[in-house]
């Protein structure tokens, strides 16, 4: 296996524990796996070199293409491509499979066991216009928890370990879209914590089904509708946990 970027504190452990271990169990030899994360649109020289010289059955794990701008012609040189961020333009490619964003390092390890929830719903994240609309819709729904930071990866954001405690104590976790794509780390972190992600449709579609398949999420038409659906579970949290 080779890597072209430091997977650091973000989805590094998710990749190693789930994705790469599955490849190792299924294929036996990871010498043909390349994990790539970068900002440039064109494939890096290392990807091109890897695709040219490594033998057949090469696997590319492509991260970081949040704005769906990376050139993907190189995909045809790999037997299998796993990538973050669903792109409908790649649906026809039989060698391309979607990966969720995974979780940050503090959410690594076994999933939380089911327990009584301290919060019916929670949200921890940065302040944005669409999130203000979301929180306004949930303002009248009691037993919620909200923590707003000044920005993504900012000095005042919660420590991941503290965020995990909040999610583990929440029946539902509100999961608005990220900066440029519907998917965020928050979705898998909620699942890893034993909570139910609450999402809304994008352009009238449940975009998460293209990555997660038949998932257990709350999928609403808008945030007002989402609040109504969550409110319906207020007096039956065990049913919500069983979703």
Residue ranges and their predicted role:
Residues 162, 225-228:
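An acidic, carboxylate-rich microenvironment
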């Amino acid at each position: 296996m080779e890597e072209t970027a430091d997977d650091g504190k973000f989805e590094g452990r998710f990749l190693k524990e789930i994705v790469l271990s599955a490849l190792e169990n299924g294929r036996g030899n990871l010498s043909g796996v390349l994990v790539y994360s970068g900002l440039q649109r064109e494939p890096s020289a290392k990807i091109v070199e890897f695709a040219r010289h490594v033998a057949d059955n090469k696997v590319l794990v492509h991260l970081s293409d949040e704005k769906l701008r990376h050139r993907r012609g190189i995909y045809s040189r790999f037997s299998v491509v796993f990538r973050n961020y669903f792109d409908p333009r790649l649906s026809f490619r039989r060698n391309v499979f979607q990966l969720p964003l995974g979780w940050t390092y503090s959410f690594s390890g076994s999933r939380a066991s089911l327990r009584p929830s301290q919060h019916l719903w929670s949200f921890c994240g940065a302040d944005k216009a669409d999130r203000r609309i979301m929180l306004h819709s949930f303002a009248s729904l009691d037993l919620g928890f909200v923590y707003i930071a000044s920005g993504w990866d900012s000095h005042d954001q919660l420590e991941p370990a503290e965020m995990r405690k909040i999610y583990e104590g929440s029946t539902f976790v509100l999961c608005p879209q990220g900066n440029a794509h519907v998917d965020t780390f928050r979705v898998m972190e909620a699942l890893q914590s034993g909570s139910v992600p609450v999402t809304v449709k994008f352009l009238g579609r449940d975009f998460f089904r293209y990555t997660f398949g038949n998932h257990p999420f709350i999928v609403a038409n808008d945030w007002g509708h989402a609040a109504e659906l969550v409110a319906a579970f207020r007096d039956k949290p065990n049913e919500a946990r069983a979703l």
